[in-house]
């Protein structure tokens, strides 16, 4: 059902079973796929694609221009996957030409009120962003990350899978997977054991990650030495992912 007060461009592609509430504005070249519900006063701008089964709450703004002074109206996009919940006043900006040109959001994410996803961000799946969580431009977020309220991530940072970011945290560097980060200049505060247990990590896998965590963050060893010991003494795919994340970091890691 489409409310009579909604303004929908003739070149927007809206699947027949999409619900659109009152006073929504949907611009040209927007794609909205089946089963999605768009509540009142939502603005979706040109070049946005929204997948199946999403629920978008009032006053969300998706696909707006990037907050980048070099942007001159180029044709860039926002791609949003399936089954996402996007709450009130969320803003998701389109990409920039000098970035990837696309801002991407995966599947099954819960993006709470006033959260912001800036230009060229790549957000994975099963991510939770609490109220006012903010991602600056070019941030990459892996799957199953949780952001507390009012946290902020610096441009070009990466957040590893299963990380937990506490509320009011400022993130100036990459956050490795599986850890808890907190503080105005984020520091590691342990392994995210509760999150790992909820996602069926075995006791043995968690124990190995704890050993790696202690070497990385609770020893006085240089980072390269810690990584060398981990690679020589610890095994498993999660260890490999942890080491690969750290060794490919360009900004350095929170430590």
Task: Enumerate the language-model features and the residues they cover.
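Structural signal for interior beta-strand "rungs" in well-ordered beta-sheet cores
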Residues: 1-182, 186-187
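Terminal amphipathic alpha-helical/low-complexity segments used for targeting or macromolecular assembly
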Residues: 1-5, 10-11, 16-17, 53, ...
């Amino acid at each position: 059902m489409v409310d009579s007060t909604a303004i929908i461009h003739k070149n927007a592609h809206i699947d027949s079973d999409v619900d659109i509430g009152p006073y929504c504005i949907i611009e040209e070249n927007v794609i909205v796929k089946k089963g999605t519900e768009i509540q009142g006063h939502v603005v979706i701008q040109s070049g946005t694609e929204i997948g199946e089964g999403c629920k978008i709450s009032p006053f969300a703004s998706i696909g707006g221009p990037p907050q980048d002074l070099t942007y001159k109206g180029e044709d860039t996009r926002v791609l949003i996957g399936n089954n996402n919940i996007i709450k009130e006043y969320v803003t998701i900006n389109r990409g920039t030409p000098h970035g990837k040109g696309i801002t991407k959001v995966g599947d099954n994410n819960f993006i709470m009120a006033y959260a912001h996803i800036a230009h060229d961000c790549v957000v994975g799946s099963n991510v939770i962003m609490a109220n006012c969580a903010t991602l600056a431009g070019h941030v990459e977020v892996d799957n199953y990350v949780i952001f507390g309220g009012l946290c902020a991530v610096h441009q070009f940072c990466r957040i590893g899978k299963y990380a937990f970011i506490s509320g009011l945290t400022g993130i100036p560097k990459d956050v490795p997977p599986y850890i808890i980060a907190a503080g105005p200049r984020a520091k590691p505060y342990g392994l995210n054991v509760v999150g790992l247990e909820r996602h069926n990590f075995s006791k043995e896998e968690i124990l190995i990650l704890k050993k790696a965590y202690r070497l990385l963050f609770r020893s006085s060893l240089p980072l390269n030495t810690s990584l060398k010991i981990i690679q020589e003494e610890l095994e498993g795919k999660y260890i490999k992912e942890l080491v690969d994340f750290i060794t490919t970091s360009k900004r350095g890691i929170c430590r």
